[in-house]
């Protein structure tokens, strides 16, 4: 990208900032949304973070999506059929839809997007969601045929993932690799500007295909990293919605009669992976001991202010095909006994890294450090920022990695068991390929996960996914911690704006009232 291009973009952004101050038009029905971090890219195919994909929902849509309860819904698709061999998906498209640049959304546009997403040469971060596609064909303007390399029964759920959006082919041709700065989609709002430290601005798209929507004139997405500042913007009325709300401030905001505090159910699972290829974590008794050593109820009280529930399995309960187990009980005596049996009567020393450095992560690290010390395990803790995580955890394979204990979380935005299990537990998902930071490998789990994708029979899938979860729960490659509740707050004047279980937002029906 040239210096001139960067300067031009920043000049445009500065002009928009000035317009926001000088022009009363922006204040008509502008919802200001304060979020917890900056955005990495406005190309959902090349973004790994949920916030970037949430913002992209302003201007982009996919063929399918999820409602607020993570139930699959049609969006730009009207219907679909699957061939008897599970290889071909024929999708009928909604007629009369236009991109923001005036070009038609049609089967040819779907082909362009899926060809781009499934081509490994493009090196897009979300390639794994589309790598099973063999070819995409435009049958006619409103019919697209997608052929897979092998049966993959979770494919429609993958197409409902927030990465699987439809970008204007004309814009892709015009901007190429710069499309992340020039989004053009079919969504309710049109992109205006991105000031990369201060805001993303979108405005109502007058040609939106759903009558009567959107109701807001514009949305300003503001990254506000500091927890106190984010909450303060809400209290002063400078923002109408804020997420995440720091758990320790929830009770303060709850007392403000102009605000609504909402604790939503989630599929955000928190855990500590243990690198099972390294001593002492190659010993299952050590892994079991560490699960017994952590008081999950106390952790939830201390770190999450009660806004979480103990993990009841490898999957959150609301994920399709999840199996519910009894949480690992707190039993430090049992933990010490298991460590002794494993050959570590005096414990051991190791490291604990975190994928985030915010206040909740810091509390989890400190609490875990104290709990493990009580059974003789001494840990040195490091809270990482996004750059460190990408380099040291996601970017290194089993021979180079320094990962031992790693605190992180996962939200399976397809709503289905495959995306909640395969990236985290399959042998093929060891970093840097995907996110199996435990470097866990169980041939039967691999077989179960592969076979579950070859069948569309729900009973058979349930049996296979249950067997995989049974083995993962018993093998304990993680310290299974908690499933978070998602705490947001909003002005009572803002309606129809909420956090979904996968941590993305729903706001198509959002409105501001006086």
From Swiss-Prot:
Domain of life: Bacteria
Signal peptide from the UniProt entry: 1-27
GO molecular function per UniProt: peptide transmembrane transporter activity
Keywords: Periplasm, Signal, Transport
Keyword Signal assigned: yes
Principal subcellular localisation of the protein: periplasm
Subcellular location: Periplasm
GO biological process, any: dipeptide transport
SUPFAM superfamilies: Periplasmic binding protein-like II
Gene Ontology terms: cellular component: ATP-binding cassette (ABC) transporter complex; outer membrane-bounded periplasmic space
One Pfam family hit: SBP_bac_5
Subunit structure: The complex is composed of two ATP-binding proteins (GsiA), two transmembrane proteins (GsiC and GsiD) and a solute-binding protein (GsiB).
PANTHER family with a match to the protein in the record: GLUTATHIONE-BINDING PROTEIN GSIB, PERIPLASMIC BINDING COMPONENT OF ABC TRANSPORTER
Protein family: Belongs to the bacterial solute-binding protein 5 family.
Function: Part of the ABC transporter complex GsiABCD involved in glutathione import. Binds glutathione.
Protein name (record): Glutathione-binding protein GsiB
Phylogenetic classification of the source organism: Bacteria, Pseudomonadati, Pseudomonadota, Gammaproteobacteria, Enterobacterales
